[in-house]
From Swiss-Prot:
Residues 1-35 form the signal peptide. The keyword Iron-sulfur does not apply. SUPFAM superfamilies: Trypsin-like serine proteases. Its main location: secreted. The gene is splA. This is Serine protease SplA.
Length: 235
């Protein structure tokens, strides 16, 4: 992999809060996209597709079934430093879906940066996970020039885990590798990449170190990867 490629998600080195992640964060505003105009904050994440997106301490994940989240291996591994907690569709103004402890992690056996995270059904606040999220459906496929959106938690600790959505275009697909130009930053690792129907095409895992808005990279969900995920959804 090009040395300019950086993993987006290993930056949340802070103390946990009641939300599950960081405290004593500055109240000063933070710029998420200095040059891009295709990114917006999602202030109310209580409806689909936003309520299928969850925050890890240093990244993002997407709900695909009962108690089942898809994210990156590097996010799932690093999250145990932060007490294995996941926050369901947290946003700045909308009602969040609760904070959930991780039950177990199933890593994809191949080279792809893909992992399944199962959470306990009841949150620390007594909420039911499956009643407070939606399940994102898989896309049948995707191709170059398809419009996509990326939803997640860029610079999560710095922004107090505000949710953001960016849009862009798929530039290249080769096997399980996908390149696109939707804006992303550290914290977007594991973010769902959705098509125009809000169906799941894949997840983001890395980006260009030269210019984060130039190009980003994702795990494209081939039939084989979708089968792996579906076989690991809790029954």
């Amino acid at each position: 992999m090009n040395k300019n490629v950086m993993i987006k998600g290993l930056t949340a080195l802070t103390i946990l809060t009641s939300l599950g992640f960081a405290e004593n964060i500055s109240d000063q505003p933070h710029s998420i996209a200095k040059a891009e105009k295709n990114i917006k904050e999602v202030t109310d994440a209580t409806k689909a597709p936003y309520n299928s997106v969850v925050a890890f301490a240093g990244g993002t994940g997407v709900v695909v079934g009962k108690n089942t989240i898809v994210t990156n291996k590097h996010i799932a591994k690093s999250n145990d430093i932060f007490k294995n907690r996941v926050s369901a569709h947290h946003s700045s103004k909308g009602k969040g879906g609760g904070n959930y402890d991780v039950k177990d992690i199933v890593e994809y056996p191949g080279k792809e940066d893909l992992a399944i995270v199962h959470v306990h059904e009841t949150s620390t606040e007594g909420l039911n996970f499956n009643k407070n999220v939606s399940y994102t459906k898989f896309a049948e496929g995707a191709k170059m020039k398809d419009r996509i959106s990326v939803i997640g938690y860029p610079k999560g600790a710095q922004t107090k885990y505000k949710m953001f959505e960016s849009t862009g275009t798929i530039n290249h697909i080769n096997g399980t590798f996908m390149e696109f130009d939707a804006y992303a930053q550290p914290g977007n690792s594991g973010s769902p990449v959705l098509n125009s129907k809000n169906e799941l095409v894949g997840i983001l895992y890395a980006g260009s170190g030269k210019d984060e808005s130039e190009k980003n990279f994702g795990v494209y969900f081939t039939p084989q990867l979708k089968e792996f995920i579906q076989n690991n959804i809790e029954k």
